Amino acid sequence: MKQTTIAAIATAIVPQQGSIGIVRLSGVEAVSIAKQLFQTPGKQQWESHRVLYGYIQQPLTQQIIDEGLLLLMLAPRSYTREDVVEFHCHGGMIAVQQVLEACLQAGAELAQPGEFTLRAFLNGRLDLTQAEGVADLVGARSPQAAQAALAGVQGKLASPIRELRQRCLDTLAEVEARVDFEDDLPPLDEAGVQAELQDIHATLQAILATADQGELLRNGLTVAIIGRPNVGKSSLLNAWCRCDRAIVTDLPGTTRDVVESQLVVGGIPIQVLDTAGIRETEDQVEQIGVTRSHQAAQSADLVLLTIDASVGWTSDDQQLYQAFQDLPLILIVNKVDLVPQEQVVYPEAIAQVVSTIAAQNQGISELETAILETVQTQSLKAANLDWAINQRQAAALQKAQAALEHVQGAIADQLPLDFWTIDLRGAIQALGEITGEDITESVLDRIFSRFCIGK
């Protein structure tokens, strides 16, 4: 890594006035740059892990920019294991931008996305699973997602991966010893090797089982509410969100565009799309809304087909069902205060049916239960989720599994020991990719490019 000193704003920049903003420096010149910018009244000592009070100034003109605090963390006792300085100034957009510009004028370089965490990884402060956990924690959209990400930051995924990799290394050492010193050692216990590989493979499979949960926690679900006009789609959205998110009237075609809202159900972030009522219409604007409704439903992870119990199942409902029946679908029978669900006839192939009285906020908890059952995540509880692997980690685990299967095949086919070692090394390399012990620069670039600038 180049011996440069980097700088970035570490707090969110929003148009509203914030109370505090943080600008972070890391690198060999962090302290010297900070001393160009920070004036401390009195005789405050520049010591590691101490907070100093003073004024931040332009390095060239000595014009005062802001009044604030400075936090000094000297290597190796810092996030990056380099000298780190943080300016804690007033929030908002102007003050932090001026402090950052002053850092750059004094010799710092603007940090790339994730560069602070990349340096922490390269300097041995974090392994790769912990670094990815940092990104997931920053981007978490639910408490469960945050807790699963925190488990990654704490190394709860890296620990079993390292243990499995070490077991593969131990097995490889046993096999290679027989290749190099066959006459000096007892015969290899092939049954024992097979049993060990099977156990490692099973453990990898158990870790892989968290991949779908991890994907749900990170990316969530998109749920589209569809149906004919005036069946209560917007009322359902408002009841679900507990606010007047969508306009509700008795006039068909009130909703002309897709209305979005964000919710969390059982720890899963959900984007809810309230769509325009789907019907044949000569109104050009409404027709655009109908087209967008179709597009939203086709791209959704789950469709809530909503019907009016007082009207019953119509030919239009049947057409909508046929259009979206290949997608995960829940039937919402709304307005059951007018006609009980038992009197409504609908296709028997629909497995999930929920009764609601959206105008009275009834049936929402049953709807959320049905959603969790549909995506098979009833057990998705933060307390039971030690970690949640991402797609990159899952791909590496699958590579390791395939390599172990090849070794087992070589044993079964009585192939020479040299064949065993090739795939054992493949499994070891794949597991090393997860923790970063065996990783390419291009993969690192791809991982850290999704970080925010100041992390």
Swiss-Prot record:
The record ties this protein, via PANTHER family, to: TRNA MODIFICATION GTPASE GTPBP3, TRNA MODIFICATION GTPASE GTPBP3, MITOCHONDRIAL
Binding-site residues, Mg(2+):
S234, T255
Record: residues binding GTP: 230-235, 249-255, 274-277
Q: Does the keyword Transport apply?
A: no
Q: Where in the cell is it found?
A: Cytoplasm
Q: Which cofactor does it need?
A: K(+)
Instruction: Name the source organism.
Output: Acaryochloris marina (strain MBIC 11017)
Q: Which domain of life is it from?
A: Bacteria
Gene behind this protein: mnmE
**InterPro entries the record matches:** G_TrmE, GTP-bd, GTP-bd_TrmE_N, GTPase_MnmE, MnmE_dom2, MnmE_helical, P-loop_NTPase, Small_GTP-bd
Give the EC number(s) under which this enzyme is classified: 3.6.-.-
Name recorded for this polypeptide: tRNA modification GTPase MnmE
Similarity comment: family membership: Belongs to the TRAFAC class TrmE-Era-EngA-EngB-Septin-like GTPase superfamily. TrmE GTPase family.
Checking Pfam families in the record gives: MMR_HSR1 (PF01926), MnmE_helical (PF12631), TrmE_N (PF10396)
> Which lineage is the organism of this entry classified under, starting from the top rank?
Bacteria, Bacillati, Cyanobacteriota, Cyanophyceae, Acaryochloridales
Cofactor: record remark: Binds 1 potassium ion per subunit.
GO biological process: what's one of them? tRNA wobble uridine modification
Subunit (UniProt): Homodimer. Heterotetramer of two MnmE and two MnmG subunits.
